[in-house]
Amino acid sequence: MEELDCEPAVTWIPGVNSKKKQMCFDWGPGEMLLCETSFNQTGKSEKVPSCPFIYIIRKDVDVYSQILRKLFNESHGIFVGLQKIEEELSGKSRKAQLVRVSKNYRSVIRACMEEMHQVAIAAKDPASGRQFSSQVSILSAMELIWNLCEILFIEVAPAGPLLLHLLDWVRLHVCEVDSLSADVLGGDNPSKHENFWDLVTVLVLQGRLDEARQMLAKEADANPSCAGMCRVLGDLMRTMPILSPGNTQTLTELELKWQHWREECERHLQDNTFAANPRLESLCKIMLGDEAALLEQKELLSNWYHFLVTRLLYSNPTVKPIDLHFYAQSSLDMFLGGESSPEPLDNILMAAFEFDIHQVIKECSIALSNWWFVAHLTDLLDHCRLLQSHNLYFGSNMREFLLLEYASGLFAHHSLWQLGVDYFDYCPELGRVSLELHIERIPLNTEQKALKVLRICEQRQMTEQVKSICKILAMKAVRNNRLGSALSWSIRAKDAAFATLVSDRFLRDYCERGCFSDLDLIDNLGSAMMLSDRLTFLGKYREFHRLYGEKRFGDAASLLLSLMTSQIAPRSFWMTLLTDALPLLEQKQVIFSAEQTYELMRCLEDLASGRPECGEPDAQRLQDDDIETTKVEMLRLALARNLARAIIREGSLEGS
């Protein structure tokens, strides 16, 4: 099934006049930058823009609410657990697990709503109080919708139990009766309380007939003149047939008993049993499902879906799921009476009663301020195998699209982005690509955060992102002159070019200071030094210094010579290497052989003559520098002396 988008709602931004000015904007993962340009709509430029501000527009502001963040965190664990439900489970065991998951989601919504309610009460600022109260209303509506979807789509309650579930639904969400009961029963004489009959009526409207009978007993004790009528009505309440969860009677048996009970109620009305007490007579009419009597209690019913459930309770207690939408539509029409139009919540509930899952999701997406509700509800319904046929026209399915939108919103927050990773993981078609795009945009403010991001990328073999993050961290370290950290990140990124750059900085630092920093890192490069020639040279040059320090002069000399003759050393560093050879040339014992000395001489002359082998300008710089010229002369002298000593020594060895 394909579904095309409709025109989105227009959002007006205060201070921005798009009719006069051309706008400039740039999208981010969860935000948009917007500003007016200096051009008007005719294309003419003005020197000064009328609104020289840049606006940051956020599409998911709810992620910044402290309380709603608890909702996001708690539901994340439920979501991940749901994805791990074994596909092999079937029948009652699978259904029971899905119902349990749904109840867990609802409990999280309710806990969040109750906390928000307490904050709204405690708010000192009226504007904040109104904002929190608005959020309470939204959360209450979310729980109301979710609970109904649970009954109709997940429980899939059949005729009989369906009404019991709907009664529980109404009792849970129309809860003013509890505070009213506490108020009435808290007095010395409840039957004389001004709201006594309102309480009795509401109890009957909600099918709480045992409690209503108890209230009538109090009225009978306080008013003996109507005791007989109260007793008769109480007996009718007691004998009303209701299909209880543990009852084994069939629907046919229930319908026969209910029909008999209804005839008895009608007989009492026809006999004017309650004529002397209009309130009791009204209650009897309600129990007969009299629509006029029910509509007289509009104020106590408070909404059309309460009216619907009460109407079904007393007129068709064995209503079949397929007939629900007829009763729902007529109840809505009767309750509103043409005086007002349905609210968005009414449309959502009506779509649910029509068993139109996709319309429920669509209406919720429009009405609610974030993607949390529709993403999690759709995912749960998809696990119930109710959405397999619904694909969107751009290639993704509805579940994945909504999860991607929700996860994208989480990535706009400085800490909730970690939750978003798991949502992307469970989107098989576009999740990986979306995660790659979003994770590259996370600001790496601290090294701890960078390590978290890096670990996530490495666990998912996101090679390019790992390289990118490591390179960013390496560049930050270089800017802060933390060369050891920079080298570690470039090695981790396997970035040869950047490793070369950092190695050059190490060598330059050595030339300026005469010693290496971060010796532990350089000493333990291991196979990582093969990443680039310059890094190999850095590691080997440090090894030369270590050998020299250990007085292993022969090994040090061989390594130094190999660094020069293998062309691995940068030409700009040759003079430093030759200078390092001076102490070895001046040793009492001959370290360099005649052949090795010839090689050193050749390297020195190559450097002094300025052969442009590597295109570097160092030879020309040496010729112009008196100090370097002095070094060259000293090296020539030392090499000549060492050559003479080496020839004599080698000749003596041959003669012997």
Curated annotation (Swiss-Prot):
It is found in: Nucleus, Nuclear pore complex; Chromosome, Centromere, Kinetochore; Cytoplasm, Cytoskeleton, Spindle; Cytoplasm. Keywords: Acetylation, Centromere, Chromosome, Cytoplasm, Cytoskeleton, Kinetochore, Membrane, mRNA transport, Nuclear pore complex, Nucleus, Protein transport, Translocation, Transport. The modification N6-acetyllysine is found at residue 92. One of its GO terms (biological process) is macrophage chemotaxis. One of its GO terms (cellular component) is ciliary basal body. GO terms for molecular function: CCR2 chemokine receptor binding. The modification N-acetylmethionine is found at residue 1. InterPro entries: Nucleoporin_Nup85. Belongs to the nucleoporin Nup85 family. Essential component of the nuclear pore complex (NPC) that seems to be required for NPC assembly and maintenance. As part of the NPC Nup107-160 subcomplex plays a role in RNA export and in tethering NUP96/Nup98 and NUP153 to the nucleus. The Nup107-160 complex seems to be required for spindle assembly during mitosis. NUP85 is required for membrane clustering of CCL2-activated CCR2. Seems to be involved in CCR2-mediated chemotaxis of monocytes and may link activated CCR2 to the phosphatidyl-inositol 3-kinase-Rac-lammellipodium protrusion cascade. Involved in nephrogenesis. PANTHER family: FROUNT PROTEIN-RELATED, NUCLEAR PORE COMPLEX PROTEIN NUP85. Component of the nuclear pore complex (NPC). Component of the NPC Nup107-160 subcomplex, consisting of at least NUP107, NUP98/Nup96, NUP160, NUP133, NUP85, NUP37, NUP43 and SEC13. Interacts with NUP160, NUP133 and SEC13. Interacts with NUP37, NUP107 and NUP43. Interacts with CCR2. This is Nuclear pore complex protein Nup85. It comes from Mus musculus.
